[in-house]
Amino acid sequence: VGDHHVTGSPYYQNTPMLGRLLAEWGDADVGALYLLPLWQPVLLAEQIATLASIAEGRFIMQCGLGRGDDQFSALGQNIRFRPSAFEESLKCLRQMWRGETVSSKGRFHFSAATISPIPPEPIDVWIGANATVAIERAARMGDAWLAEPSLTVEQAKTAFNTYRQARERLGLSMPDTIAIRRDIHVSERPNEADMVQRQINQTGYRGFSMDALTIGDPDQVASEFRALYEIGYTDIIIRSLHPDQGHTIASLQRLAKVKDLLK
């Protein structure tokens, strides 16, 4: 579940949506994305600790700097201070989740904050990063790194090597999880994939290169996923490209074939 604010179209906020989903979720891993510079750390620590206490399985906080002047201005934050606000927030979050009393006089100002409940087990922190300095921050501060969906396979290989080298310089082994998101459509036939690709190319897609999008039949999608696994990525998170719900559901159903091909 993502984190967007002051959007032009309806966007249902991540914390209440995830709280509802957890009623049906079971014990599988679960999590959400939070843009740390936009959130008051005590409020966010409480929200995530509550979700983690409800969840039956591991809770993952994906996090990043965020972008877009509109949402920073609307929430009273200075976009120029994103890196320092991110690092300060993450440090405070981890302290509060351990049950510590925390004060801050940096980008955020609060005194003697404690939260309850505290998470029943440690929160996994996956840091989304694309620029070299951000990938190095993810290597230093995160339990895992989440590569952005705008990368082509070749760019994903370069970014992976940047992350690996940063971990080596820090004297750290590679984590169990190195994830990447792909925006995809799994078609029934190659000609359907060509049609979807033409439609997306005509309208543009978030400024991404078309080579960064995963569009194809199950064999084609499995081939790209296999290339990412061979680079060293352990987890692929998908977002559906097609705007039509029926096509999206059909694409998700075809992912079962992709999974079989990767065994």
Located regions from the model:
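Active-site-adjacent structural elements that line small-molecule/cofactor binding pockets in enzymes
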Residues: V1-K263
